[in-house]
């Protein structure tokens, strides 16, 4: 897995921020029902973000990410991937995600992202919507730029870039991406090599996709974790870049 059970996002809460949150169940166009966690400001949001977790699905780490976004005036919804194979129950620490990830296909994930985007637009009032993913979710965040969702940008932390489980990855589908890309990568990531990252950047450039690929020297996979104190400065910079990307691509 990407993060330990006691991991958390290295983002300090904003004291006094008025944020509402709730567990919700969303339904995709194909009829799939899946769990999600919605958070947002008590005032109209400046934009919306679909938060895409790692391979564990909807976990408290990503609920916290949604809350931190809400404190920034952003409507956020973190989604689970496994409604089709495991129902809408909460994912505990003993959830056998390794049984379900191989059954999770890109088309299904994109259908679920579409439902989350619609929720942010119709229920939360966010006209401009982004995706933000981590690891497994980073990959699907970038792919969502080819999903026909009309998103304003796709952000991914240490996502895989090539083929996986017989399906094309962001490199192979770079020509289909229709939104700016932000990639935040670890220079010491053993799962996603420097060659993988370079190939992704080359593919984006060749396809004419607006992009920024940032590699943090010495940072491991899943560096964005408050337990990883050695990467505190890296994580702070990455979070600043996330917020700056949202600002840069939100009209007005």
Language-model regions, residue ranges each:
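N-terminal cap/leader regions of alpha/beta-hydrolase-fold enzymes
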Residues: 1-252
